[in-house]
Amino acid sequence: RDRITARNIKQIHKFSGLLDFTFINYLKNIFIKNTKNRSKTNISKHYDLGNEFFSLWLDKTLTYSSAIFDEKNKDLSDAQNNKYQKLIDLIKPGTGDKVLEIGCGWGGFAEYLGKKYDVKLDCITISKKQFEYAKERIYRCGLNEKVNIQIKDYRDLKDKYNSIASIE
C-alpha cells in the first residue's frame, strides 16, 4: 500500500484543495434553493443524456442505484430485483392500495411491483427521457391500467397514497 501511495503522491497533492472546494459546494447548496426549475435542469443535464448511454452500463432493468446482493444473487439484475422486493416488504402494499414512486427512473421498480401486486401505482419523474422510456416499458408489459407514469415534480402532488417509495 505504501508503494502505491508513494507512486500516487503527485496525484494526491493535486487534490489538496478539494476540501476547500467541497466546503464551497456545501455553502453554495445552502444558499441556492432547489427550485422546481433548478431540479428539472439538474435532472435533465444528467438523466437526459440518452437512454442508450445508460443501457451500455446498467443492468437490464436500467436501475440506477445500488443493488442488494445475497447468497442467491448471481448477477446485477437479480440483486436489483432483490432490492425491489426488500422495499416492497417494507411498504407492505395491500390489494387495491394506491402507491407512489417518486423518481421512477426507467420504470424497473414500477414493472416489478405492477407484475407481482394488485395495486394502483403512480410513478413520477422530471426526466423527459426516463418518462418516455418508462411509459413505453409499462405499455409493453400490459401494465398501463395499473401503472401511471407521469412527468411531475413531487411538490405538485395532490393525491393521497397508502405507501410511498423512492429508490436512491
Model-derived segments and spans:
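Conserved SAM-binding loop of SAM-dependent methyltransferases across substrates and taxa
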Residues: 106-118
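Conserved SAM-binding strand-loop segment of SAM-dependent methyltransferases
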Residues: 141-154
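N-terminal auxiliary segments of SAM/dcSAM-dependent transferases
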Residues: 2-57
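Conserved alpha-helix/loop element of class I SAM-dependent methyltransferases that forms part
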Residues: 60, 64-65, 71, 75-96
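A short acidic, Gly/Pro-enriched loop at the edge of an enzyme's catalytic core
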Residues: 155-164
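Conserved class I S-adenosyl-L-methionine
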Residues: 95-103
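Conserved SAM-binding loop
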Residues: 134-135
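Conserved SAM-binding motif I beta-strand of class I
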Residues: 120-125
